[in-house]
């Protein structure tokens, strides 16, 4: 299906012309913030589900167990390692890169108290699925703004350019790699972790496709 075979982040009428743009269109900033807010809400839902953390948190846990450093420090160094991979991939940062960290963290802090505790395992699983879909929707919207991706999304788009593979496949490969490495290092994998690892790639791809179509952009070369 074309919706899952997007091979580039679409540039639409309201996208910034360049990621490193110091005077981006206000509409691009608006959608950047909306996308990142939804991203944060989705992460909060995954946390609230309580059946497994995100793949990159599993990796940070593994690094923490192996090295003895705190989980916060491990998360920081994992992010630094991801950003260092941007150099050979020639990935450009932008205001969206910094906004990614600030807005998502602030959203989690604000929204978490309002997430109701799910009743039973079915409720937990459903919340994890909804969280994954919401992260995917938010990712697609903020990436189309073209103001710079966050660390993980930058790795995704950079690897996609190098390999030519669909974004959904590349993202799934990245998330599964993080899960496996984290688990081997001693991190804890839950059902929610697996849901996110397999679901986020297709969710991001679908969001990119739908965001472009809703913006009046015809998809041709982006997908087979």
Model regions: which residues?
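Core subunits and conserved enzymes of cellular information-processing
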Residues: 2-224
